[in-house]
Structure formats: structure tokens, C-alpha cells
């Protein structure tokens, strides 16, 4: 079954149209143009925002009152080896098992289609709805994420735009659609550490300073450190060394320098400044000649039980019969940028079992359920 099949539902028809556009990050491949045409027909005011090489748009419908925003990305990761796919990655096929196959099916063109169709139905049923509905869409989520949601949020905040609630369409579900929603994410703090020694001949170690030997006890202490206990919403902060590099490639040369890359995934129990000071204190304790460059990817955020989480949970229960489980596990998402506006943020999307993999796929019927969950959430908040 393909995108041209007359038996496809509106959600699946749109999902297939989006998947068939090869929008490998940061290319949008006119996915946003397709979405904007649909939203304009539903009464939305459109504001394209091309920033550097990245396509973004902001769309809004409604007046004063609370604003519910749907956020997501049209870009996808590269396919990997095309010959390893059972079907061409941008053909958007529904197979014999009822799976919608294609790059972006789960992450996250299926969610985008469900959002659009749910909103179209809602504004048709409730043309005089309360508050406003908005869309914040980017083509720079899978890449550096410098000129996408982060940049749009900065512009919206600068002009005082209101954003009360936001549903991000990231694939949050693990086994069944709606079984897990993300109501927060840990912060991500990375660093490049350089330890300086003195290069020399291995036969004359007294004339050199081996940075590997010098750094090893400090790195071991950092790896063993207990950073915090976490809390009811977040696991304890984790520290991981991801890269170590030193040496000339020769067995008879003591290197002059060691570089290490490491990352914190940190909870709301720790701060950026606190983690940095503790790392630097350990390095000083070991008497190292060190330099560190820090890179903050995002602060932790948390949406506690309230209007948005309650509405989403009630909608999932009504549509699927199951209780959802809020979670803050996993990596970062664009929700971290939106949360800086004081917005309640929840990530809700399809099952994430095959995201970024060869043969990415999602159960087609799950997108119908997701559309209904989005629709019922709109009803609970804005009808």
C-alpha cells in the first residue's frame, strides 16, 4: 500500500506524503510548505522563519487566552546503507503486518501528520475554541540544533509571545502508543579536557611527564564520584567519559598531551556551575596541568502534574484504556528550549523501537490512535 492508495486515512495519507520527501537534516524538502498549506486552510496565520540554512515556521490560530503549541521537526537522520532496507527508505509503504515503513515514520513525520489532522478536525468541530493553537516546526533537530527551535524560541520570547502548553511529537512510547510520555529531560553538559605533560623517550621517563599516568587517577575519581541522588522525577546524575586520545602512535614515545571528552546527564538536583566546580576541584587535587572547554547542550526541565499532563493522561486513558507513565529518561529534545519560556512541556508520540535504524517503522494504526489522543487533548484544554 502506498501514499496514492485511496484506502488511506487522512493521517496516513499525510504521513506518507511527508515521508516521501527526503528531508535529511537540515534539508526540509518542502515538508513545511505542505504543512503550512494545510494550516492556512484551517485559519492559521503563518510566519516562516528561515534562519541561516534552516527552515522553521511559527503558525498561530485564535485569540487571547491560553496557548497550546504543537512542536516538532521535519528533518530526519540519514538512511544508512539503502541496500539494507527491506523497502526504499522514502517510499512510504505499509507492509503486510500493517507497519508504515520509511525514514521518519516514527521520528517524527507520523506525529506531524497526526497533529495536523487532529487540529484540522478540532477547528472544524470547535471554530470558536478558547485560547489559541500554535505550531513550532523546524528542520534542525537531528543536526546541530543551533538555528532551529532554539533560535525561534529566542525570537518568540523577545516579542513576548505566550506559550502555556506544548506537546512535542517525539516518539515517547516504548511498547504501546501512549504507554510513556516524557514530562522532562535531563540536562546535558559536555566537556573537552586537556591534560598537559612533557613528551619524551620511554627509556628516560625521568625527563618526561606522562599525561596518561598523571590523568588516570583523576579520571578514575571522576568516574567513581557520586554527583547527586536524583529525585522523584530524575535518576541520579551520570558522568561518562566518551573519548580518550593521547600518544604519537609510536611505542617508544611518551606523549606530551592527553585529551578526554566527557558528558554529564544531570538532574535538577545539580547545577552547571556546581558540576564544573567539582570537576575542577578534582583536577586541582591531583596537581594536573589542565584546561577544560565546557559545552552546555541543555538544562534539565520538568513538567509536574498539572493541566497539560492531566489532559494528556486522560486522553490516553480514554483512547487506549491504559494509564500512561511519565518519564524523564532518554536523551535531550527540543523541549528543553521551549521549557525556557515557562511552558508546560510533554513529549507524546509513537513507539520508538526503530528510530534512527534501518527499516524504521511504526504501526499504522498507532498513528490513528495518536491523532485521536491529540484531538481529545485539544478538546480537554481548549473546547
From Swiss-Prot:
Its EC number is 3.5.1.18. GO terms for molecular function: acetylornithine deacetylase activity; cobalt ion binding; succinyl-diaminopimelate desuccinylase activity; zinc ion binding. Pfam families: M20_dimer, Peptidase_M20. Its cofactor is Zn(2+); Co(2+). Zn(2+) 1 binds at residues 73, 107, 170. The keyword Amino-acid biosynthesis applies. It is an enzyme of class 3 (hydrolase). It catalyses: N-succinyl-(2S,6S)-2,6-diaminopimelate + H2O = (2S,6S)-2,6-diaminopimelate + succinate. Keywords: Amino-acid biosynthesis, Cobalt, Diaminopimelate biosynthesis, Hydrolase, Lysine biosynthesis, Metal-binding, Zinc. The keyword Magnesium does not apply. One of its GO terms (biological process) is L-arginine biosynthetic process. InterPro entries: ArgE/DapE_CS, Bact_exopeptidase_dim_dom, DapE_proteobac, Peptidase_M20, Peptidase_M20_dimer, Peptidase_M20A. Zn(2+) 2 binds at residues 107, 142, 356. HAMAP family: DapE. NCBIfam families: dapE_proteo (TIGR01246), PRK13009.1 (NF009557). Catalyzes the hydrolysis of N-succinyl-L,L-diaminopimelic acid (SDAP), forming succinate and LL-2,6-diaminopimelate (DAP), an intermediate involved in the bacterial biosynthesis of lysine and meso-diaminopimelic acid, an essential component of bacterial cell walls. This is Succinyl-diaminopimelate desuccinylase. It comes from Pseudomonas paraeruginosa (strain DSM 24068 / PA7). The gene is dapE.
Amino acid at each position: 500500500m502506498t501514499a496514492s492508495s485511496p484506502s488511506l486515512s487522512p493521517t496516513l495519507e499525510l504521513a506518507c506524503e511527508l515521508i516521501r520527501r527526503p528531508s535529511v537534516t537540515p534539508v526540509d524538502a518542502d515538508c513545511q510548505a505542505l504543512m503550512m498549506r494545510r494550516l492556512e486552510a484551517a485559519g492559521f496565520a503563518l510566519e516562516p522563519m528561515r534562519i541561516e540554512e534552516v527552515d522553521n515556521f511559527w503558525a498561530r490560530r485564535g485569540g487571547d487566552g491560553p496557548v497550546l503549541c504543537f512542536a516538532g521537526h521535519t528533518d530526519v537522520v540519514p538512511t544508512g546503507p539503502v541496500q539494507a532496507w527491506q523497502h526504499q527508505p522514502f517510499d512510504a509503504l505499509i507492509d503486510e503486518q500493517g507497519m508504515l515503513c520509511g525514514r521518519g515514520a516514527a521520528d517524527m513525520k507520523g506525529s506531524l501528520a497526526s497533529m495536523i489532522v487532529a487540529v484540522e478536525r478540532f477547528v472544524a468541530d470547535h471554530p470558536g475554541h478558547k485560547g489559541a493553537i500554535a505550531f513550532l516546526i523546524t528542520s534542525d533537530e537531528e543536526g546541530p540544533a543551533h538555528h532551529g527551535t532554539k533560535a525561534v524560541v529566542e525570537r518568540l520570547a523577545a516579542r513576548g509571545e505566550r506559550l502555556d502548553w506544548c506537546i512535542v511529537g517525539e516518539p515517547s512510547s516504548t511498547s504501546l502508543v501512549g504507554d510513556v510520555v516524557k514530562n522532562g529531560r535531563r540536562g546535558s553538559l559536555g566537556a573537552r579536557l586537556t591534560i598537559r605533560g612533557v613528551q619524551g623517550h620511554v627509556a628516560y621517563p625521568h625527563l618526561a611527564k606522562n599525561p596518561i599516568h598523571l590523568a588516570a587517577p583523576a579520571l578514575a575519581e571522576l568516574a567513581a564520584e557520586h554527583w547527586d541522588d536524583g529525585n522523584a522525577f530524575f535518576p541520579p546524575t551520570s558522568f561518562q567519559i566518551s573519548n580518550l586520545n593521547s600518544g604519537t602512535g609510536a611505542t617508544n614515545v611518551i606523549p606530551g598531551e592527553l585529551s578526554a571528552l566527557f558528558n554529564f546527564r544531570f538532574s535538577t538536583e545539580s547545577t552547571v556551575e556546581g558540576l564544573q566546580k567539582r570537576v575542577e576541584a578534582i583536577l586541582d587535587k591531583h596537581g594536573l596541568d589542565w584546561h577544560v572547554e565546557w559545552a552546555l547542550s541543555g538544562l534539565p526541565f520538568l513538567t509536574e502534574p498539572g493541566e497539560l499532563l492531566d489532559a494528556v493522561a486522560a486522553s490516553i486513558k480514554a483512547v487506549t484504556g491504559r494509564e500512561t507513565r511519565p518519564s524523564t529518561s532518554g536523551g535531550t529534545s527540543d523541549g528543553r528550549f521551549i521549557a525556557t519560556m515557562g511552558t508546560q512541556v510533554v513529549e507524546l508520540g509513537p513507539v520508538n523501537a526503530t528510530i534512527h535504524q534501518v527499516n524504521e517503522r511504526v504501526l499504522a494504526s498507532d498513528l490513528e490512535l495518536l491523532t485521536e489522543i491529540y484531538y481529545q487533548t485539544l478538546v480537554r484544554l481548549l473546547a
